[in-house]
Amino acid sequence: MAVPARRTSKAKKNKRRTHYKVTAPSVNFDETTGDYSRSHRVSLKGYYKGRKITKAASAE
């Protein structure tokens, strides 16, 4: 098995880890329902791009 020739320094390790981050989800205001929903997804009331796609989710 291959073994690293030198130990990875703290700076090198931390620079590599700077790319591991969480991005906030994009949320848009839906004018049809008056609610906020995520992009490219059907809203809880069953609308997508202002058109009715499915029945609204029931709260059972």
UniProtKB/Swiss-Prot annotation:
It comes from Streptococcus pneumoniae serotype 4 (strain ATCC BAA-334 / TIGR4). This is Large ribosomal subunit protein bL32. GO terms for biological process: translation. Pfam families: Ribosomal_L32p. Keywords: Ribonucleoprotein, Ribosomal protein. The gene is rpmF. Belongs to the bacterial ribosomal protein bL32 family. Disulfide bonds: none annotated. InterPro entries: Ribosomal_bL32, Ribosomal_bL32_bact, Ribosomal_zn-bd.
